[in-house]
Amino acid sequence: MYTFKIGIPAEVHDTFVKNHPLCNLLQSSSWAKVKDNWGSEIVGVYEKDTLVASSLVLIKPLPAGFTMLYTPRGPVMDYTNERLVSYFMAELKKFGKKKRALFIKMDPAVHYQDFHLGEEHQPHAEATAIVETLKKAGAKYQGLTMDMGATIQPRFQANIYREDFSEEQLSKSTKKMIKTAEKKGVVV
């Protein structure tokens, strides 16, 4: 039995997000402070006394008293649990109606593909299944658009993993900027 809750305490939400495989900075409660021109609320789903899904929801005022809701890189939950996804989405829609939202945007931190430059890449089968689960729950999938205006966050993310990184790879100007920052007290 699931229970949807509005007003999850920030520390409870942050602990849940930090310990979840889909952890993302944009789902931290602190992100709401960065987006201080939007309202915010933390919502979640409990199964008995255990938080099983949570999301920072940003609320942007629109003309005529309407809003739009946005869950940056969220909601954070087990997307392989169709019952949970369906319940969360239904409750999020009800929450949106209370907030007079015209629409809800979301872009969960589900990796569609992961690859190193030059490697062949295929979509993750689980990501494709997650898209189908979300569609069954009523989400409208925007597809793999290349139009930057169609999404709020960039679709592509380039990473340099710690195990693949060495300072020798950096350009001379980057090394100089790092040294300058360190002299000014920035920890790099």
Regions flagged by a language model, labelled:
Residues K33-Q122:
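Conserved donor-binding loop and adjoining core beta-sheet/short helix segment
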